[in-house]
Amino acid sequence: MSAVMNTIGVAFAYAVLALFAQNAIFTRGLGVSRLIQLVGDERTSSWWFALLLCVTQTLVAPLAYFAGSQIVDLPYHAQLRPLLYLACVAVVCIFEHAILRAVKGPRSGLLIRILPIAAVNSGVLGTVLVERTQSFTLAQSIGFGLGSGLGYLLAVMLVTEAGNRLRSKAIPEAFRGLPITLIYIGVLALAIYGFTGHSVIL
């Protein structure tokens, strides 16, 4: 029983680490291009996009852990690693697509349309590569995947909410739109970077 609690504790600790201190967007820049495209896009729900990305990252983590451990002894495992993890993302995406088609809920059409955009994302593949290059255990990988997904959800919500406020007339016209969004993301990234204990040299 204590081993199970210890494993859950490790997974939770890594989830919190990935959510706040190692946020995929603000500390590593993973998925920023997709995040910027989401701001102001009325066709794609930011909430559902981030939720699908979170589920995808959580499901890919154990699959990539087991698949990655199978190629360790191969001579070119470093070159095969990204392809293998991309295949893991594809398998999870196909699985999620099949589930969404089988359920046929009121939002199934929307979720099926958003799924490829959310699953095939540098945030998902980058998180898996971080997990495997750092040699995380299974519990650490699952926790980090969940935390990274929740961190992406947090970042999407922060930037989407800011997008509504960044349309102010007080902002000079040259900075409206993409420039002010990038400045806002940069300031948030510096705040997270400072939160992790790094000093910012200006």
Go through each PLM region and give its residues.
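Generic transmembrane alpha-helix signature in multi-pass membrane proteins
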Residues: 29-35, 99-102, 114, 122-135
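Interfacial loop-to-transmembrane junctions
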Residues: 164-183
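Small-residue-rich segments of transmembrane alpha-helices in multi-pass membrane proteins
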Residues: 52-61, 113-129, 177-189
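Juxtamembrane transmembrane-helix termini in multi-pass membrane transport proteins
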Residues: 14-55
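Juxtamembrane boundary at the C-terminal end of a transmembrane helix
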Residues: 6, 190-202
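Transmembrane alpha-helical segments of integral membrane proteins
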Residues: 153-169
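Structural signature of hydrophobic alpha-helical transmembrane segments
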Residues: 10-26, 77-91, 142-155
